Amino acid sequence: MFNTMTYEVEPTSILYFGYGSNLDNEDWTIWCEKRGDDPSGLIEIGAAWLDGYQLCFDYYSRSRKGGAANLKKTNRKNTATPGALFEIDDYTLDLLDRKEGVNIEDCYQREIVTVYTQDGSSHQAITYTHQSSEDVYYQPTKDYEALIRNNLERLELPSDWLDYAINKSPQPEFNLIFVYGTLMKGMSRHSEIESDCDFLGYGTVKGELYQISDF
């Protein structure tokens, strides 16, 4: 298992967002140990989401003998990619750079992104993307697909976005809304959203409620 901890992220930490094979501890460990490197510096913090990017398979991996996961920035609303946030050190960052082919032509490169953890916090993190000049698709192998799918399940994250990327099925959307206060069912302003929404039930969310002002 990954070294998974529950703690506040230190401001000086290097954070990394993984969304593909690096979600899998065994796969990461095998890659490192084959090269005589220490895999222990990839410390999983927990599940996370990257907003505004769509999972795709437009990169062919010779080592995987099929398509490899990539991220494509999109202007579409309600698009995000699930994955995990990790804390890493400089040594592990160098390992990730080597694994992803940074500084090698037509391989993955670092990108700074904003990801959101399950508590709603935002974090600046490094991830790796490949800039493809063509709209192409490479079928991933079943084993590679399973690496991602099994770890999304482990992280209790949905696999809808993975299914879309593989099968070109309809793009999942965030079409649920949590409301509180006067927009709730039976309250004074609920009629403003009633015609456009179907009530599914009551729920709770972790957070703090503030009195801002009258408006």
Please place each PLM-identified region on the residue numbering.
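A glycine-rich, hydrophobic/aromatic-adjacent loop/helix-cap motif
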Residues: 2-215
